[in-house]
Design a protein with these regions (language model features):
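Phosphate/anion-contacting hairpin/loop surfaces
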Residues: 1-149
Length: 149
């Protein structure tokens, strides 16, 4: 069981991380997120997430506006363990009007995956300390690749 912290002072030397992922939602601490830097990314919304208790900062959640089922079922290979599976996306089902989206229809438990294109990946990597937190995996799209963030 965890403890509920009502003040940042209860953490001692621990500090609020710059990034977090909670239930597949991507959070960025507000002091390092420049909304103007992300304004060119298509298909996202930014929502303020207040931290309960006495914390000096809030987070901004990067929310994908689209949930897309674009799994190429012919070329994808599903195994019992997802790490052994091969995901291939059907490019014809991905609208050009989005730089990132939640992938539907792949996880057997119904979880969505965050999928971003190269433009969004590069925009995110320009954020302060992003290279320390963000990990991307290339996935195949009908012979090309896209990034799984």
């Amino acid at each position: 069981k965890g403890l509920i912290a009502k003040s940042i002072s209860e953490f001692g030397q621990i500090r609020m991380p710059e990034f977090a992922e909670v239930s597949h939602l991507f959070l960025v601490r507000e002091d390092i997120l420049n909304i103007n830097e992300l304004s060119s990314i298509k298909g996202i919304s930014l929502k303020r997430v207040s931290v309960y208790g006495d914390f000096p900062l809030d987070y901004m959640a990067i929310i994908f506006n689209e949930v897309i089922d674009c799994v190429d079922n012919i070329h994808s290979k599903r195994e019992e363990f997802e790490c052994m599976s091969t995901l291939v996306l059907d490019m014809s089902k991905i609208p050009s009007s989005v730089d990132g989206f939640f992938l539907k229809g792949w996880n057997k438990y119904g979880f969505y995956k965050n999928i971003v294109n190269e433009n969004m990946k590069m925009q995110l990597l320009h954020l302060y300390k992003a290279n320390e937190f963000l990990k991307f995996k290339e996935i195949e799209i009908n012979g090309t690749s896209v990034t799984n963030g």
